[in-house]
Protein backbone atom coordinates (compact mmCIF):
# COMPACT_ATOMS: atom_id res chain seq x y z
CA UNK A 1 0.00 0.00 0.00
CA UNK A 2 2.82 2.44 0.84
CA UNK A 3 4.64 1.76 -2.41
CA UNK A 4 1.43 2.15 -4.38
CA UNK A 5 0.83 5.50 -2.70
CA UNK A 6 4.39 6.63 -3.47
CA UNK A 7 4.13 5.84 -7.18
CA UNK A 8 0.94 7.86 -7.47
CA UNK A 9 2.55 10.93 -5.84
CA UNK A 10 5.96 10.95 -7.47
CA UNK A 11 7.77 9.95 -4.26
CA UNK A 12 10.62 7.46 -4.55
CA UNK A 13 11.75 4.92 -1.93
CA UNK A 14 15.43 4.06 -1.68
CA UNK A 15 14.74 1.16 0.71
CA UNK A 16 11.63 -0.62 1.97
CA UNK A 17 12.09 -2.83 5.04
CA UNK A 18 9.52 -5.06 6.75
CA UNK A 19 10.82 -6.35 10.09
CA UNK A 20 8.13 -8.93 10.86
CA UNK A 21 8.49 -10.10 14.46
CA UNK A 22 12.06 -8.70 14.71
CA UNK A 23 13.64 -12.06 15.53
CA UNK A 24 17.11 -10.84 14.56
CA UNK A 25 16.93 -7.28 13.16
CA UNK A 26 15.30 -4.33 14.92
CA UNK A 27 14.24 -0.81 14.03
CA UNK A 28 17.42 0.45 15.71
CA UNK A 29 19.54 -1.61 13.31
CA UNK A 30 17.70 -0.07 10.37
CA UNK A 31 18.06 3.46 11.72
CA UNK A 32 21.79 2.98 12.24
CA UNK A 33 22.15 1.69 8.68
CA UNK A 34 20.08 4.45 7.06
CA UNK A 35 21.93 7.17 8.96
CA UNK A 36 24.82 6.88 6.51
CA UNK A 37 22.88 5.75 3.43
CA UNK A 38 23.49 8.44 0.77
CA UNK A 39 20.36 7.51 -1.20
CA UNK A 40 17.99 8.10 1.75
CA UNK A 41 16.93 11.66 2.65
CA UNK A 42 13.82 11.03 4.78
CA UNK A 43 13.07 8.00 6.98
CA UNK A 44 9.48 6.87 7.55
CA UNK A 45 8.40 4.21 10.02
CA UNK A 46 5.41 2.35 11.35
CA UNK A 47 6.14 1.11 14.88
CA UNK A 48 4.11 -1.08 17.21
CA UNK A 49 6.77 -1.71 19.85
CA UNK A 50 10.46 -1.06 20.43
CA UNK A 51 12.30 -3.79 22.31
CA UNK A 52 15.40 -1.81 23.31
CA UNK A 53 14.19 1.73 23.81
CA UNK A 54 17.49 3.16 25.00
CA UNK A 55 19.33 1.86 21.95
CA UNK A 56 16.61 3.31 19.71
CA UNK A 57 16.98 6.68 21.43
CA UNK A 58 20.75 6.64 20.84
CA UNK A 59 20.24 5.73 17.18
CA UNK A 60 17.61 8.44 16.72
CA UNK A 61 19.84 11.09 18.27
CA UNK A 62 22.54 10.09 15.82
CA UNK A 63 20.42 10.23 12.67
CA UNK A 64 17.90 13.05 13.23
CA UNK A 65 20.42 15.92 13.06
CA UNK A 66 21.10 14.72 9.50
CA UNK A 67 17.79 13.30 8.27
CA UNK A 68 14.18 13.62 9.43
CA UNK A 69 12.69 10.49 11.00
CA UNK A 70 8.88 10.38 10.89
CA UNK A 71 7.05 7.62 12.74
CA UNK A 72 3.50 6.42 13.24
CA UNK A 73 3.32 4.67 16.62
CA UNK A 74 0.43 2.23 16.89
CA UNK A 75 -0.82 1.12 20.28
CA UNK A 76 -1.22 4.59 21.75
CA UNK A 77 -4.42 3.60 23.57
CA UNK A 78 -4.87 0.77 26.06
CA UNK A 79 -6.81 -1.30 23.52
CA UNK A 80 -4.25 -0.60 20.81
CA UNK A 81 -1.38 -1.48 23.14
CA UNK A 82 -2.96 -4.86 23.93
CA UNK A 83 -3.41 -5.58 20.24
CA UNK A 84 0.15 -4.48 19.46
CA UNK A 85 1.58 -6.65 22.24
CA UNK A 86 -0.36 -9.64 20.94
CA UNK A 87 0.77 -8.95 17.39
CA UNK A 88 4.49 -8.52 18.05
CA UNK A 89 4.90 -10.68 21.12
CA UNK A 90 6.59 -7.86 23.04
CA UNK A 91 5.42 -5.26 25.54
CA UNK A 92 4.14 -2.09 23.95
CA UNK A 93 5.32 0.10 26.84
CA UNK A 94 3.64 3.31 27.94
CA UNK A 95 2.73 5.78 25.22
CA UNK A 96 3.99 8.65 27.36
CA UNK A 97 7.45 7.04 27.35
CA UNK A 98 7.39 6.74 23.56
CA UNK A 99 6.25 10.35 23.22
CA UNK A 100 9.07 11.53 25.49
CA UNK A 101 11.71 9.41 23.74
CA UNK A 102 10.59 10.52 20.28
CA UNK A 103 10.81 14.14 21.37
CA UNK A 104 14.26 13.74 22.91
CA UNK A 105 15.49 11.76 19.91
CA UNK A 106 14.21 14.34 17.43
CA UNK A 107 11.71 11.87 15.94
CA UNK A 108 8.60 13.46 14.43
CA UNK A 109 5.47 11.58 15.39
CA UNK A 110 2.65 11.41 12.87
CA UNK A 111 -0.78 10.86 14.37
CA UNK A 112 -2.13 8.83 11.44
CA UNK A 113 -0.90 7.14 8.28
CA UNK A 114 -2.43 10.06 6.37
CA UNK A 115 -0.25 12.46 8.41
CA UNK A 116 2.78 10.24 7.72
CA UNK A 117 2.27 10.55 3.97
CA UNK A 118 1.59 14.29 4.21
CA UNK A 119 4.86 14.87 6.05
CA UNK A 120 6.73 12.58 3.66
CA UNK A 121 5.64 14.76 0.73
CA UNK A 122 6.77 17.97 2.39
CA UNK A 123 10.16 16.72 3.53
CA UNK A 124 10.92 14.82 0.32
CA UNK A 125 10.00 17.64 -2.05
CA UNK A 126 10.80 20.92 -0.30
CA UNK A 127 13.73 22.58 1.47
CA UNK A 128 13.36 23.29 5.16
CA UNK A 129 12.09 26.80 5.93
CA UNK A 130 14.78 29.23 7.04
CA UNK A 131 12.31 30.95 9.37
CA UNK A 132 8.73 30.56 10.52
CA UNK A 133 6.91 33.43 8.77
CA UNK A 134 4.14 32.09 6.54
CA UNK A 135 2.31 33.89 3.74
CA UNK A 136 -0.98 32.45 2.50
CA UNK A 137 -2.04 33.25 -1.08
CA UNK A 138 -5.63 32.38 -2.00
CA UNK A 139 -8.40 33.06 -4.50
CA UNK A 140 -11.15 32.41 -1.93
CA UNK A 141 -11.64 33.72 1.58
CA UNK A 142 -12.80 30.51 3.28
CA UNK A 143 -9.76 28.29 2.63
CA UNK A 144 -7.45 31.17 3.53
CA UNK A 145 -9.20 31.65 6.87
CA UNK A 146 -8.99 27.91 7.62
CA UNK A 147 -5.27 27.96 6.89
CA UNK A 148 -4.75 31.05 9.06
CA UNK A 149 -6.72 29.49 11.93
CA UNK A 150 -4.60 26.34 11.80
CA UNK A 151 -1.39 28.37 11.69
CA UNK A 152 -2.39 30.35 14.77
CA UNK A 153 -3.35 27.21 16.70
CA UNK A 154 0.06 25.72 15.92
CA UNK A 155 1.95 28.90 16.75
CA UNK A 156 3.07 29.67 13.19
CA UNK A 157 3.26 33.46 12.72
CA UNK A 158 1.80 34.97 9.56
CA UNK A 159 4.25 37.20 7.71
CA UNK A 160 3.60 40.93 7.66
CA UNK A 161 2.87 42.19 4.14
CA UNK A 162 5.38 45.04 4.11
CA UNK A 163 4.90 48.33 2.26
CA UNK A 164 7.57 47.47 -0.37
CA UNK A 165 5.90 44.10 -1.01
CA UNK A 166 2.50 45.76 -1.33
CA UNK A 167 3.94 48.18 -3.86
CA UNK A 168 5.29 45.31 -5.98
CA UNK A 169 2.12 43.22 -6.05
CA UNK A 170 -0.56 45.95 -6.00
CA UNK A 171 -0.42 46.78 -9.76
CA UNK A 172 -1.27 43.17 -10.66
CA UNK A 173 -4.36 42.99 -8.43
CA UNK A 174 -7.92 44.30 -8.69
CA UNK A 175 -8.99 46.88 -6.10
CA UNK A 176 -11.22 44.33 -4.33
CA UNK A 177 -8.22 42.16 -3.41
CA UNK A 178 -7.13 41.88 0.21
CA UNK A 179 -3.48 42.69 0.86
CA UNK A 180 -3.45 41.38 4.40
CA UNK A 181 -2.34 37.86 5.18
CA UNK A 182 -3.95 35.76 3.75
CA UNK A 183 -3.50 37.67 0.50
CA UNK A 184 -6.83 37.16 -1.26
CA UNK A 185 -6.55 37.82 -5.02
CA UNK A 186 -10.29 36.96 -5.39
CA UNK A 187 -12.12 34.34 -7.38
CA UNK A 188 -11.50 35.54 -10.93
CA UNK A 189 -7.72 35.20 -10.57
CA UNK A 190 -6.10 33.64 -13.60
CA UNK A 191 -2.61 32.16 -13.74
CA UNK A 192 -0.96 35.48 -14.62
CA UNK A 193 -2.30 37.12 -11.45
CA UNK A 194 -1.01 34.23 -9.34
CA UNK A 195 2.30 34.36 -11.19
CA UNK A 196 2.82 38.08 -10.56
CA UNK A 197 2.34 37.71 -6.82
CA UNK A 198 4.38 34.51 -6.56
CA UNK A 199 7.30 36.07 -8.45
CA UNK A 200 7.31 38.95 -5.98
CA UNK A 201 7.33 36.49 -3.07
CA UNK A 202 10.25 34.44 -4.39
CA UNK A 203 12.94 36.75 -3.04
CA UNK A 204 10.89 38.56 -0.38
CA UNK A 205 13.07 38.48 2.79
CA UNK A 206 10.11 38.89 5.17
CA UNK A 207 8.45 35.66 3.96
CA UNK A 208 9.94 32.25 4.81
CA UNK A 209 7.24 29.93 3.48
CA UNK A 210 4.35 30.28 1.04
CA UNK A 211 1.08 28.35 0.94
CA UNK A 212 -0.70 28.59 -2.43
CA UNK A 213 -4.44 27.92 -2.27
CA UNK A 214 -6.72 27.52 -5.27
CA UNK A 215 -10.42 26.76 -5.49
CA UNK A 216 -11.72 26.01 -9.00
CA UNK A 217 -14.02 28.79 -10.19
CA UNK A 218 -15.38 29.97 -13.54
CA UNK A 219 -12.22 31.80 -14.61
CA UNK A 220 -9.63 29.70 -12.75
CA UNK A 221 -6.75 28.13 -14.71
CA UNK A 222 -5.55 25.28 -12.47
CA UNK A 223 -2.92 23.81 -14.82
CA UNK A 224 -1.39 27.17 -15.76
CA UNK A 225 -1.45 28.26 -12.11
CA UNK A 226 0.35 25.06 -11.12
CA UNK A 227 3.03 25.76 -13.73
CA UNK A 228 3.34 29.35 -12.51
CA UNK A 229 3.80 28.09 -8.93
CA UNK A 230 6.53 25.64 -9.93
CA UNK A 231 8.28 28.20 -12.12
CA UNK A 232 8.20 30.99 -9.55
CA UNK A 233 10.00 29.02 -6.84
CA UNK A 234 12.27 26.69 -8.86
CA UNK A 235 15.73 26.85 -7.31
CA UNK A 236 14.72 29.59 -4.87
CA UNK A 237 15.37 27.64 -1.67
CA UNK A 238 12.08 28.97 -0.28
CA UNK A 239 9.52 26.54 1.12
CA UNK A 240 6.30 26.41 -0.92
CA UNK A 241 3.29 24.16 -0.33
CA UNK A 242 0.01 24.05 -2.22
CA UNK A 243 -3.60 23.09 -1.69
CA UNK A 244 -5.54 22.98 -4.95
CA UNK A 245 -8.97 22.02 -3.68
CA UNK A 246 -11.30 19.68 -5.52
CA UNK A 247 -10.87 16.43 -7.44
CA UNK A 248 -11.37 15.98 -11.20
CA UNK A 249 -10.99 19.68 -12.03
CA UNK A 250 -7.56 19.92 -10.38
CA UNK A 251 -6.27 16.37 -10.97
CA UNK A 252 -3.94 17.35 -13.83
CA UNK A 253 -2.69 20.44 -11.99
CA UNK A 254 -1.81 18.31 -8.97
CA UNK A 255 0.36 16.15 -11.21
CA UNK A 256 2.10 19.25 -12.53
CA UNK A 257 2.80 20.41 -8.98
CA UNK A 258 4.07 16.99 -7.95
CA UNK A 259 6.37 16.65 -10.96
CA UNK A 260 7.68 20.14 -10.22
CA UNK A 261 8.49 19.29 -6.60
CA UNK A 262 5.62 21.18 -4.95
CA UNK A 263 3.57 19.01 -2.57
CA UNK A 264 -0.19 19.44 -2.84
CA UNK A 265 -2.66 18.76 -0.04
CA UNK A 266 -6.36 18.03 -0.30
CA UNK A 267 -7.22 20.68 2.31
CA UNK A 268 -5.28 23.71 3.63
CA UNK A 269 -5.10 22.43 7.21
CA UNK A 270 -3.01 19.44 6.17
CA UNK A 271 -0.54 21.69 4.37
CA UNK A 272 -0.15 23.91 7.45
CA UNK A 273 0.36 20.89 9.71
CA UNK A 274 3.11 19.71 7.37
CA UNK A 275 4.79 23.11 7.54
CA UNK A 276 4.58 22.93 11.34
CA UNK A 277 6.42 19.59 11.30
CA UNK A 278 9.10 21.07 9.03
CA UNK A 279 9.54 24.00 11.41
CA UNK A 280 9.82 21.62 14.37
CA UNK A 281 12.48 19.62 12.56
CA UNK A 282 14.41 22.81 11.77
CA UNK A 283 14.51 23.54 15.51
CA UNK A 284 15.60 19.95 16.20
CA UNK A 285 18.56 20.34 13.87
CA UNK A 286 19.56 23.64 15.44
CA UNK A 287 19.37 22.15 18.95
CA UNK A 288 21.41 19.04 18.09
CA UNK A 289 24.51 18.50 20.20
CA UNK A 290 23.19 19.45 23.64
CA UNK A 291 25.01 17.35 26.19
CA UNK A 292 23.66 15.84 29.38
CA UNK A 293 24.62 17.95 32.37
CA UNK A 294 25.87 16.55 35.64
CA UNK A 295 24.12 17.36 38.90
CA UNK A 296 26.67 18.74 41.41
CA UNK A 297 27.04 17.93 45.10
CA UNK A 298 25.90 14.32 45.13
CA UNK A 299 26.95 11.64 47.62
CA UNK A 300 26.04 8.32 46.01
CA UNK A 301 27.72 6.27 48.76
CA UNK A 302 25.11 7.36 51.33
CA UNK A 303 22.27 6.54 48.94
CA UNK A 304 23.87 3.18 48.12
CA UNK A 305 23.96 2.22 51.79
CA UNK A 306 20.25 3.02 52.26
CA UNK A 307 19.22 1.12 49.12
CA UNK A 308 21.34 -1.91 50.04
CA UNK A 309 19.98 -2.06 53.60
CA UNK A 310 16.39 -1.83 52.36
CA UNK A 311 16.85 -4.66 49.86
CA UNK A 312 18.69 -6.79 52.43
CA UNK A 313 15.70 -6.41 54.77
CA UNK A 314 13.41 -7.75 52.04
CA UNK A 315 11.45 -4.51 51.74
CA UNK A 316 10.35 -2.68 48.59
CA UNK A 317 8.96 0.54 50.02
CA UNK A 318 11.38 2.90 51.71
CA UNK A 319 10.32 4.79 54.78
CA UNK A 320 10.10 8.54 54.64
CA UNK A 321 13.35 8.96 56.58
CA UNK A 322 15.15 6.63 54.16
CA UNK A 323 13.73 8.36 51.08
CA UNK A 324 14.67 11.70 52.55
CA UNK A 325 18.20 10.50 53.22
CA UNK A 326 18.68 9.45 49.60
CA UNK A 327 17.38 12.76 48.28
CA UNK A 328 19.55 14.72 50.72
CA UNK A 329 22.53 12.77 49.40
CA UNK A 330 21.62 14.11 45.95
CA UNK A 331 21.40 17.72 47.03
CA UNK A 332 17.75 18.18 48.01
CA UNK A 333 16.90 20.20 51.08
CA UNK A 334 13.95 19.67 53.44
CA UNK A 335 12.36 21.79 56.16
CA UNK A 336 13.55 21.07 59.71
CA UNK A 337 12.14 17.74 60.84
CA UNK A 338 12.31 15.10 63.57
CA UNK A 339 11.06 11.55 64.15
CA UNK A 340 9.05 10.46 67.19
CA UNK A 341 7.79 7.03 68.15
CA UNK A 342 5.58 8.13 71.06
CA UNK A 343 3.34 11.02 72.03
CA UNK A 344 5.90 12.22 74.61
CA UNK A 345 8.63 11.94 72.00
CA UNK A 346 6.57 14.05 69.59
CA UNK A 347 6.14 16.78 72.22
CA UNK A 348 9.87 16.70 73.00
CA UNK A 349 10.70 16.98 69.31
CA UNK A 350 8.37 19.95 68.99
CA UNK A 351 10.12 21.65 71.92
CA UNK A 352 13.52 21.15 70.30
CA UNK A 353 12.29 22.67 67.04
CA UNK A 354 11.19 25.79 68.93
CA UNK A 355 7.88 27.58 68.75
CA UNK A 356 5.92 27.85 65.55
CA UNK A 357 3.69 25.79 63.33
CA UNK A 358 4.48 22.16 62.42
CA UNK A 359 3.10 19.33 60.30
CA UNK A 360 2.78 15.78 61.61
CA UNK A 361 2.75 12.75 59.28
CA UNK A 362 2.54 9.02 59.87
CA UNK A 363 5.69 6.99 59.27
CA UNK A 364 4.96 3.48 57.99
CA UNK A 365 6.66 1.54 55.17
CA UNK A 366 3.27 0.09 54.18
CA UNK A 367 1.57 3.48 53.76
CA UNK A 368 2.44 5.47 50.66
CA UNK A 369 -0.58 7.82 50.52
CA UNK A 370 -0.80 9.24 54.02
CA UNK A 371 -3.88 11.41 53.62
CA UNK A 372 -5.96 8.38 52.56
CA UNK A 373 -5.65 6.94 56.07
CA UNK A 374 -5.87 10.17 58.05
CA UNK A 375 -2.12 10.22 58.51
CA UNK A 376 -1.47 13.96 58.20
CA UNK A 377 -2.19 16.93 60.47
CA UNK A 378 -1.32 20.48 59.46
CA UNK A 379 -0.58 23.74 61.26
CA UNK A 380 -0.11 22.33 64.76
CA UNK A 381 0.68 25.06 67.29
CA UNK A 382 1.67 24.16 70.84
CA UNK A 383 2.39 20.99 72.78
CA UNK A 384 -1.27 20.11 73.33
CA UNK A 385 -1.94 20.20 69.58
CA UNK A 386 1.06 17.94 68.97
CA UNK A 387 0.08 15.37 71.61
CA UNK A 388 -3.53 15.27 70.40
CA UNK A 389 -2.46 14.96 66.75
CA UNK A 390 -0.24 11.98 67.58
CA UNK A 391 -3.17 10.11 69.12
CA UNK A 392 -5.56 11.04 66.30
CA UNK A 393 -3.15 9.98 63.56
CA UNK A 394 -2.18 6.64 65.09
CA UNK A 395 -5.82 5.81 65.90
CA UNK A 396 -6.94 6.64 62.37
CA UNK A 397 -4.19 4.54 60.79
CA UNK A 398 -4.95 1.54 63.03
CA UNK A 399 -8.59 1.76 61.99
CA UNK A 400 -8.12 2.33 58.24
CA UNK A 401 -4.91 0.33 57.68
CA UNK A 402 -4.89 -2.32 60.43
CA UNK A 403 -2.13 -4.38 58.82
CA UNK A 404 0.33 -1.47 58.55
CA UNK A 405 3.25 -1.29 60.95
CA UNK A 406 3.39 2.14 62.60
CA UNK A 407 6.97 3.21 63.20
CA UNK A 408 5.96 6.61 64.55
CA UNK A 409 5.43 10.08 63.17
CA UNK A 410 7.46 12.71 61.38
CA UNK A 411 7.24 16.26 62.70
CA UNK A 412 8.17 18.90 60.15
CA UNK A 413 8.41 22.65 60.21
CA UNK A 414 5.38 24.16 58.43
CA UNK A 415 6.43 26.10 55.34
CA UNK A 416 4.16 28.67 53.70
CA UNK A 417 4.39 30.39 50.35
CA UNK A 418 5.76 28.99 47.14
CA UNK A 419 4.06 26.84 44.51
CA UNK A 420 3.51 23.11 44.92
CA UNK A 421 5.11 20.90 42.25
CA UNK A 422 5.70 17.20 41.75
CA UNK A 423 8.86 15.57 40.41
CA UNK A 424 8.76 11.83 39.93
CA UNK A 425 10.36 8.85 38.23
CA UNK A 426 9.15 5.43 37.17
CA UNK A 427 10.83 2.72 35.11
CA UNK A 428 9.48 1.96 31.67
CA UNK A 429 10.16 -1.59 30.39
CA UNK A 430 11.51 -0.28 27.07
CA UNK A 431 13.11 3.08 27.86
CA UNK A 432 14.17 2.79 31.50
CA UNK A 433 13.89 5.73 33.94
CA UNK A 434 11.09 8.08 32.93
CA UNK A 435 11.02 11.48 34.65
CA UNK A 436 7.79 13.33 35.37
CA UNK A 437 7.16 16.98 36.22
CA UNK A 438 3.95 18.90 36.94
CA UNK A 439 1.88 20.81 39.43
CA UNK A 440 1.92 19.03 42.78
CA UNK A 441 -0.24 18.60 45.82
CA UNK A 442 -3.90 17.86 45.17
CA UNK A 443 -3.65 18.96 41.52
CA UNK A 444 -1.71 15.94 40.27
CA UNK A 445 -4.55 13.44 40.11
CA UNK A 446 -7.20 16.02 39.20
CA UNK A 447 -5.50 17.94 36.38
CA UNK A 448 -2.91 15.37 35.23
CA UNK A 449 -0.93 18.30 33.84
CA UNK A 450 2.48 16.64 33.63
CA UNK A 451 5.40 16.28 31.23
CA UNK A 452 7.80 13.37 30.74
CA UNK A 453 11.36 12.73 29.55
CA UNK A 454 13.62 9.68 29.47
CA UNK A 455 16.65 9.97 31.77
CA UNK A 456 19.36 11.09 31.51
CA UNK A 457 18.13 14.54 30.55
CA UNK A 458 20.02 17.61 29.42
CA UNK A 459 19.36 21.02 30.90
CA UNK A 460 17.52 21.84 27.70
CA UNK A 461 15.29 18.76 28.20
CA UNK A 462 14.58 19.77 31.79
CA UNK A 463 13.73 23.33 30.78
CA UNK A 464 11.33 22.03 28.13
CA UNK A 465 9.63 19.83 30.73
CA UNK A 466 8.95 22.87 32.89
CA UNK A 467 7.54 25.01 30.06
CA UNK A 468 5.60 22.18 28.45
CA UNK A 469 2.87 21.84 31.07
CA UNK A 470 -0.35 23.75 30.46
CA UNK A 471 -0.01 25.42 33.86
CA UNK A 472 3.38 26.95 33.07
CA UNK A 473 1.91 30.50 33.23
CA UNK A 474 1.21 29.90 36.94
CA UNK A 475 4.97 29.55 37.47
CA UNK A 476 5.76 32.74 35.58
CA UNK A 477 5.15 36.23 36.92
CA UNK A 478 1.48 37.21 37.01
CA UNK A 479 -0.72 39.74 38.83
CA UNK A 480 2.14 41.08 40.89
CA UNK A 481 3.41 37.66 41.93
CA UNK A 482 7.10 37.01 41.38
CA UNK A 483 8.11 34.23 38.98
CA UNK A 484 9.04 30.85 40.40
CA UNK A 485 12.70 29.82 40.56
CA UNK A 486 12.84 27.99 37.22
CA UNK A 487 16.58 27.40 37.53
CA UNK A 488 16.05 25.53 40.81
CA UNK A 489 13.33 23.38 39.20
CA UNK A 490 15.66 22.47 36.34
CA UNK A 491 18.38 21.61 38.86
CA UNK A 492 15.95 19.34 40.75
CA UNK A 493 15.08 17.49 37.55
CA UNK A 494 18.78 17.07 36.77
CA UNK A 495 19.41 15.62 40.23
CA UNK A 496 16.55 13.11 39.97
CA UNK A 497 17.78 12.18 36.50
CA UNK A 498 21.26 11.49 37.87
CA UNK A 499 19.84 9.52 40.82
CA UNK A 500 17.65 7.33 38.60
CA UNK A 501 20.60 6.49 36.34
CA UNK A 502 22.98 5.86 39.25
CA UNK A 503 20.56 3.47 40.97
CA UNK A 504 18.61 1.12 38.68
CA UNK A 505 17.28 -0.45 41.90
CA UNK A 506 15.02 2.58 42.45
CA UNK A 507 11.78 1.68 40.68
CA UNK A 508 9.55 4.61 41.61
CA UNK A 509 10.14 8.00 43.14
CA UNK A 510 7.77 10.84 43.98
CA UNK A 511 8.64 14.20 45.52
CA UNK A 512 5.22 15.68 46.20
CA UNK A 513 4.95 18.42 47.00
CA UNK A 514 8.20 20.01 45.92
CA UNK A 515 7.81 23.61 47.00
CA UNK A 516 9.37 26.16 44.64
CA UNK A 517 9.96 29.66 45.93
CA UNK A 518 10.29 32.88 43.96
CA UNK A 519 13.21 33.41 41.61
CA UNK A 520 16.57 33.02 43.31
CA UNK A 521 15.15 31.48 46.51
CA UNK A 522 15.31 27.81 45.59
CA UNK A 523 13.13 24.82 46.38
CA UNK A 524 12.19 22.66 49.36
CA UNK A 525 11.19 19.00 49.21
CA UNK A 526 8.23 18.55 51.55
CA UNK A 527 7.25 14.89 51.13
CA UNK A 528 8.72 11.97 49.23
CA UNK A 529 8.37 8.24 48.66
CA UNK A 530 10.40 5.56 46.87
CA UNK A 531 10.22 1.88 46.03
CA UNK A 532 13.15 -0.36 45.16
CA UNK A 533 13.82 -3.79 43.66
CA UNK A 534 16.88 -5.79 42.70
CA UNK A 535 18.37 -4.34 39.52
CA UNK A 536 17.94 -6.58 36.45
Regions picked out by a protein language model, each given a short descriptive name:
Residues 1-536:
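Catalytic-core regions of core metabolic enzymes
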Amino acid sequence: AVLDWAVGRNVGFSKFVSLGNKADISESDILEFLADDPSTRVILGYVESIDDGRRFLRAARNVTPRKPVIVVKAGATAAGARAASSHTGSLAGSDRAYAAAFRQGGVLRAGTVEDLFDLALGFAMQPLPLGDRLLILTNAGGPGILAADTAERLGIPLAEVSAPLRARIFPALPPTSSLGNPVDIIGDARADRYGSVLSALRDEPSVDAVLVLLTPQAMTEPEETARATVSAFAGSGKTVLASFLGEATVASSRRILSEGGVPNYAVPERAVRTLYAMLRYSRIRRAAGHVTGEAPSVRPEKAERIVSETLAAGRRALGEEESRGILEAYGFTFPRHAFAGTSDGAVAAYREMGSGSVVMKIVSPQILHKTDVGGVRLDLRGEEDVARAFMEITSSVRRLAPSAWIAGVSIQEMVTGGRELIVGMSRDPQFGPLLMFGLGGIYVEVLKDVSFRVAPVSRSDAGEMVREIRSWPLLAAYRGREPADEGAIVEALMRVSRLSCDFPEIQELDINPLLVMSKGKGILAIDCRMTVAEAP
